């Protein structure tokens, strides 16, 4: 039974013999790096980089559900990219705008 499942995976149109398997698998490295950057101070986060990560994730989530064969590895990695990009952008925006607003209130008060 396990052999037949492994053989089915091996021979799948998006299986390990194709770029449709390896491209999203290596793309997980970007999401993992973005998760590792959660510890990075918000002032070091790049708006352009995180916008690119977020947009790429959103665009390819949609495309991964349309293409044949359905590639759930591609879909899941792009959900992770969009989610981590949105989180990093939220951290940066809070740091740049909420922190400045709080500092201005403290100076006025």
Swiss-Prot record:
<keyword id="KW-0999">Mitochondrion inner membrane</keyword>
<dbReference type="Pfam" id="PF03650">
    <property type="entry name" value="MPC"/>
</dbReference>
<protein>
    <recommendedName>
        <fullName>Mitochondrial pyruvate carrier 2</fullName>
    </recommendedName>
</protein>
<comment type="function">
    <text>Mediates the uptake of pyruvate into mitochondria.</text>
</comment>
<keyword id="KW-0813">Transport</keyword>
<dbReference type="InterPro" id="IPR005336">
    <property type="entry name" value="MPC"/>
</dbReference>
<feature type="transmembrane region" description="Helical; Name=1">
    <location>
        <begin position="19"/>
        <end position="35"/>
    </location>
</feature>
<feature type="transmembrane region" description="Helical; Name=2">
    <location>
        <begin position="74"/>
        <end position="90"/>
    </location>
</feature>
<keyword id="KW-1133">Transmembrane helix</keyword>
<dbReference type="GO" id="GO:0006850">
    <property type="term" value="P:mitochondrial pyruvate transmembrane transport"/>
</dbReference>
<comment type="similarity">
    <text>Belongs to the mitochondrial pyruvate carrier (MPC) (TC 2.A.105) family.</text>
</comment>
<dbReference type="GO" id="GO:0005743">
    <property type="term" value="C:mitochondrial inner membrane"/>
</dbReference>
<dbReference type="GO" id="GO:0005739">
    <property type="term" value="C:mitochondrion"/>
</dbReference>
<feature type="transmembrane region" description="Helical; Name=1">
    <location>
        <begin position="51"/>
        <end position="67"/>
    </location>
</feature>
<keyword id="KW-0472">Membrane</keyword>
<keyword id="KW-0496">Mitochondrion</keyword>
<keyword id="KW-0812">Transmembrane</keyword>
């Amino acid at each position: 039974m396990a052999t037949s499942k492994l053989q089915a995976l091996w021979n799948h149109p998006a299986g390990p013999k194709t770029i449709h398997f390896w491209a999203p698998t290596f793309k997980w490295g970007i999401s993992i790096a973005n998760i590792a950057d959660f510890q990075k101070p918000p002032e070091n986060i790049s708006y352009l980089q995180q916008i690119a990560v977020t947009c790429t994730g959103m665009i390819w989530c949609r495309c991964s559900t349309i293409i044949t064969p359905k590639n759930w590895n591609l879909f899941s990695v792009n959900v992770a990219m969009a989610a981590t990009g949105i989180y990093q952008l939220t951290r940066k925006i809070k740091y740049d705008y909420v922190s400045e607003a709080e500092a201005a209130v403290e100076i006025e008060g």
